[in-house]
């Protein structure tokens, strides 16, 4: 399954989760898109609930199904911690996500574009792979030639707060993942146990 590239507002309403990070799409219409959206509240089966939760998490990070599933498989190999949380930590350590968490982009989709276009450095070296796994302490910065890109500057200015597990220097346009996040610091709206149940049946 390819990565979803359609309208984020419609997808947000379908999932009941803001993919833009603003919440505006749900504040305006908090029901699924379509002619019967306001009345489409049928009860989901156990499988339907698991699938819906998996889709919410996958779309929030903007990944294709194959890439998302492969990351879950990697999480199963961890020797410590719970599977669901380990999976979410791997998602958080993606370079595009860290760029987003630092406030260098307004959405994860935009962060992925910045990485793909070579605007981002890791420890002073250009990395254009969005899935690159960031290690706590590595310095994430903007390439010198990209420091005046309007979209990056606008994102930094628009960011009101950052998670406690990252640090950021707005003047230098650089920051780092200072530590791995705690469970209550990421995606409180997600029930990762349902995602684990879904893949345990599929794998």
UniProtKB/Swiss-Prot annotation:
* GO BP: ribosomal small subunit biogenesis; translation
Cited HAMAP family: Ribosomal_uS4_B (MF_01306_B)
* Function of the protein: One of the primary rRNA binding proteins, it binds directly to 16S rRNA where it nucleates assembly of the body of the 30S subunit.
Q: Name one Pfam family in it.
A: S4
Question: What family does the Swiss-Prot or TrEMBL record give for this protein?
Answer: Belongs to the universal ribosomal protein uS4 family.
GO terms under cellular component: small ribosomal subunit
rRNA-binding in keyword set: yes
Residue ranges occupied by any S4 RNA-binding domain in the UniProt entry: 93-156
Complex formation:
Part of the 30S ribosomal subunit. Contacts protein S5. The interaction surface between S4 and S5 is involved in control of translational fidelity.
Q: Which UniProt keywords apply?
A: Ribonucleoprotein, Ribosomal protein, RNA-binding, rRNA-binding
Name its species: Streptococcus agalactiae serotype V (strain ATCC BAA-611 / 2603 V/R)
* UniProt KW RNA-binding keyword: yes
Superkingdom is: Bacteria
Q: What is this protein called?
A: Small ribosomal subunit protein uS4
> What GO molecular function terms would the record report?
rRNA binding; structural constituent of ribosome
State the taxonomy lineage: Bacteria, Bacillati, Bacillota, Bacilli, Lactobacillales
């Amino acid at each position: 399954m390819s990565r979803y590239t359609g309208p984020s507002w419609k997808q947000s309403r379908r999932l009941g989760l803001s993919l833009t990070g603003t919440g505006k799409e749900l504040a305006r219409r908090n029901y699924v898109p379509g002619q019967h959206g306001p009345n489409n509240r049928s009860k989901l089966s156990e499988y339907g609930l698991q699938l819906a939760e998996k889709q919410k998490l996958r779309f929030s990070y903007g990944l294709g199904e194959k890439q998302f599933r492969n990351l879950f498989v990697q999480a199963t190999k961890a020797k410590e911690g719970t599977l669901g949380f380990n999976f979410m930590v791997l998602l958080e350590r993606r370079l595009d996500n860290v760029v987003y968490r630092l406030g260098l982009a307004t959405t994860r989709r935009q962060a992925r574009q910045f990485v793909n276009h070579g605007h981002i450095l890791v420890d002073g070296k250009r990395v254009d792979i969005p899935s690159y796994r960031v290690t706590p302490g590595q310095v994430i910065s903007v390439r010198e030639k990209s420091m005046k890109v309007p979209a990056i500057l606008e994102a930094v200015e628009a960011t009101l707060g950052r998670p406690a597990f990252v640090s950021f220097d707005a003047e230098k346009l650089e920051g780092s993942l200072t530590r791995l996040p705690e469970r209550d610091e990421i995606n409180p709206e997600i029930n990762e146990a349902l995602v684990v149940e879904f893949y345990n049946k599929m794998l």
